[in-house]
């Protein structure tokens, strides 16, 4: 049989299962928002705990919290950060648009843990009060966006940047010995002039290098924290200097260059910094979609496609066609890219709907951004491990397709003119003969002249 205790808020008393540490406002949220199962991301909960830890330290240093209260709050948060109370943060994303219930969830759990340590009994509001002590000098309106920024930075630095650097390393490693592999280029999915396989992959490498640069540029505004703006940006009930000292504490704890936002009205009412960052994630998804699709095309076959790359064979690909193997890692990555693009649409709409002094789409903004970061990170790591590491060029196929290409005729333009070169290409295509045979047949060049000019190795620089 379940045991319950009674907690209360301004709406009155409410029953809470005894084993949990949350209070009345968390329980009301559980009762009122039974909408799907997407919970607040763990890294956001961690960011909120870091926020409360730093706020309590500043409040103590400012003389606004007694030592006993501040210490008990700090110890409680350390236990949360150690993962001891993960099941005490059950709220879904689909709640109030300011994230108030999740902010109170954190306040209540911290106070409850602290009270248990001090009195032997969890819950309640004495001696540690969730609002008066844990939430002191704060509002959900500045705390939740601050946690959004902290979580975004931590997830990016811990997950996404390492994943992209890993992809960059393996693309560079794979292609470094491919400078002698001359293949036919393709534009409009039609044959074009030659290039090396290394040159082709250098485009992908640069896309990832630019992605990493874009992340660093977009993070500059995400480092700015709303804390200290309190309810509407004026800083009511927050001491002068709290915002600066708080940001310094967060920067010290996370080892990231957080600063207080210069204008708190903007940081509460708008989330342009996160919309911009989501745009960067969207651009990364665009880059990865292009890279993955190219590898998919170059690996098509095995006998009737381009077949210029051998992709690793990881699992059977068909329930009806024996022996079929598909580019499954490419398919997983490209599906992730479409999800990230869709997430950016959601973030864009949510970001554009900040009304007057507060944007109230905060949970859906951070949920989609953190999902995009996680999906990109995980899918890129999987793509590297199960695809990129095992890529190998099919030299024989590359040479065959290159030597058959009509577009090698381009190099003849300076010697016999565009129109005559076009006649050679059309003649070769019409009669199924080589360019050399067509050039000789049309009396434009001898075989010796043709061989001297049409040298793929001289067409790649």
UniProtKB/Swiss-Prot annotation:
The pathway where this protein functions is: Carbohydrate metabolism; tricarboxylic acid cycle; (S)-malate from fumarate: step 1/1
Residues bound to substrate are 98-100, 129-132, 139-141, 187, 319, 324-326
Q: What is its EC number?
A: 4.2.1.2
What name appears for this protein in its UniProt entry?
Answer: Fumarate hydratase class II
Q: Which UniProt keywords apply?
A: Cytoplasm, Lyase, Tricarboxylic acid cycle
Keyword Lyase included in the entry's annotation:
yes
Q: What class of enzyme is it?
A: lyase
The transmembrane segments are: none
Q: Name one GO biological process term.
A: malate metabolic process
Which reaction is catalysed here?
A: (S)-malate = fumarate + H2O
UniProt xrefs under SUPFAM superfamilies: L-aspartase-like
> What more does the record tell us?
There are 2 substrate-binding sites: the catalytic A site, and the non-catalytic B site that may play a role in the transfer of substrate or product between the active site and the solvent. Alternatively, the B site may bind allosteric effectors.
Which lineage do the record's taxonomy fields give for this organism?
Answer: Bacteria, Pseudomonadati, Pseudomonadota, Alphaproteobacteria, Rickettsiales
Under PROSITE patterns, the record lists: FUMARATE_LYASES (PS00163)
Subcellular location(s) of the protein: Cytoplasm
Q: Which residues form the active site?
A: 188, 318
User: CDD domains, per this entry?
Assistant: Fumarase_classII (cd01362)
**Gene Ontology MF terms in the entry:** fumarate hydratase activity
Query: Which residues are annotated as site, described as Important for catalytic activity?
Result: 331
Q: Pfam families recorded for this chain?
A: FumaraseC_C (PF10415), Lyase_1 (PF00206)
């Amino acid at each position: 049989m379940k045991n319950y205790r009674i907690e209360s808020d301004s709406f009155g008393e409410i029953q809470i299962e005894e084993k949990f540490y949350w209070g009345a406002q968390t329980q009301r949220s559980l009762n009122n928002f039974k909408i799907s199962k997407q919970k607040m991301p763990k890294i956001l909960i961690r960011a909120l705990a870091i926020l409360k830890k730093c706020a309590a330290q500043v409040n103590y240093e400012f003389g606004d919290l007694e030592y006993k209260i501040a210490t008990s709050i700090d110890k409680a948060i350390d236990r949360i950060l150690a993962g001891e109370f993960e099941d005490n943060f059950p709220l879904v994303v689909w709640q109030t648009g300011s994230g108030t219930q999740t902010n109170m969830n954190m306040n209540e759990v911290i106070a409850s843990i602290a009270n248990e340590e001090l009195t032997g009994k969890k819950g309640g509001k004495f001696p540690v009060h969730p609002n008066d002590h844990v939430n002191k000098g704060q509002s959900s309106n500045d705390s939740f966006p601050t946690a959004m920024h902290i979580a975004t930075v931590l997830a990016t630095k811990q997950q996404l940047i390492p994943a992209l650097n890993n992809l960059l390393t393996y693309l560079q490693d794979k292609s470094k010995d491919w400078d002698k592999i001359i293949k036919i280029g393709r534009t409009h999915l039609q044959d074009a002039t030659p290039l090396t396989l290394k040159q082709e992959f250098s485009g992908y490498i640069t896309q990832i290098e630019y992605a990493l640069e874009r992340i660093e540029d977009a993070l500059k505004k995400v480092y700015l924290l709303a804390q200290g703006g309190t309810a509407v940006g004026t800083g009511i009930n927050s001491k002068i200097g709290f915002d600066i000292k708080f940001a310094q504490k967060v920067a010290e704890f996370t080892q990231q260059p957080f600063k207080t936002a210069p204008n708190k009205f903007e940081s509460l009412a708008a989330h342009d910094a996160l919309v911009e960052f989501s745009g960067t994630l969207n651009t990364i998804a665009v880059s990865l979609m292009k890279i993955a699709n190219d590898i998919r095309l170059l690996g098509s076959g095995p006998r009737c496609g381009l077949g210029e790359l051998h992709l690793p064979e990881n699992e059977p690909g068909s329930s009806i066609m024996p022996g079929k193997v598909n580019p499954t890692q490419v398919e997983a990555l490209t599906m992730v890219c479409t999800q990230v693009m869709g997430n950016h649409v959601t973030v864009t709409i949510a970001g554009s709907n900040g009304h007057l002094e507060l944007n109230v789409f905060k949970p859906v903004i951070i949920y989609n951004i953190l999902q995009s970061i996680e999906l990109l990170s995980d899918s890129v790591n999987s793509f590297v491990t199960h695809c990129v590491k095992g890529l190998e060029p099919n030299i024989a196929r590359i040479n065959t397709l290159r030597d058959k290409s009509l577009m090698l005729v381009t190099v003849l333009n300076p010697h016999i003119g565009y129109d005559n070169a076009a006649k050679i290409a059309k003649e070769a295509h019409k009669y199924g003969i080589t360019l050399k045979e067509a050039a000789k047949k049309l009396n434009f060049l001898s075989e010796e002249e043709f061989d001297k000019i049409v040298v793929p190795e001289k067409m790649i620089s």
